[in-house]
Curated annotation (Swiss-Prot):
Protein name: 3-hydroxyacyl-[acyl-carrier-protein] dehydratase FabZ
Keywords: Cytoplasm, Lipid A biosynthesis, Lipid biosynthesis, Lipid metabolism, Lyase
UniProt subcellular location: Cytoplasm
Catalytically driven reaction(s): a (3R)-hydroxyacyl-[ACP] = a (2E)-enoyl-[ACP] + H2O
Name of the gene: fabZ
Active site (catalytic residues): H58
Length: 157
């Protein structure tokens, strides 16, 4: 293997995801990572079940995952990508999202599906990273968004 070959990680279980992200129930929206190519991209999975608390009110009789949570799931996948790529695990640094652009919702996300989150770095400059994200159900595009985040220390009291 050449030194220029990308470093590929995966699959990574939820314990590794939780080591990278500060999110916990009910807002941890990445269940596992299928593949992570350091400094490039990530493919992660969110298993969407009827037991999700948001389905109680969104919508009774026609449960659909809120679009904002689909975007949050993509953002969390991007957070794992950033933490693993930049060697931030255990550093205490957090990934703070600054902008979300060009969000498009293509198809409803209903209980019983595996939502595949594909996120790639679009640009890295200092502590600021830009990402392109897509969420799929099978081969069908459910949502897409571009977002920008910065890596920073958590706020102090």
């Amino acid at each position: 293997m050449s030194e220029d070959a990308p470093k590929i990680l995966g699959p990574l279980d939820v314990r590794r995801v939780m080591a990278a992200l500060p999110h916990r129930y009910p807002l941890l929206l990445v269940d596992r990572v299928e593949e992570l190519v350091v400094d490039e991209r990530i493919t992660a999975i969110k298993a969407v079940t009827i037991n999700e608390n948001f389905f109680q009110g969104h919508f009774p009789g026609r449960p659909i995952m809120p679009g904002v949570l689909i975007v949050e799931a993509m953002a969390q996948a991007a957070g794992v990508l950033a933490v693993e790529s930049l060697g931030l695990a255990g550093s205490g640094k957090l990934v703070y999202f600054m902008t979300i652009d060009e969000v498009k919702f293509r198809t409803p996300v209903e209980p019983g599906v595996l939502l595949r989150l594909e996120v790639a770095f679009a640009q890295k400059r200092g502590s600021v990273c830009k990402f392109e994200g897509k969420a799929y159900i099978g081969d069908k595009l459910a949502a897409q968004a571009n977002f920008t985040a910065m890596i920073a220390d958590p706020p102090t009291d």
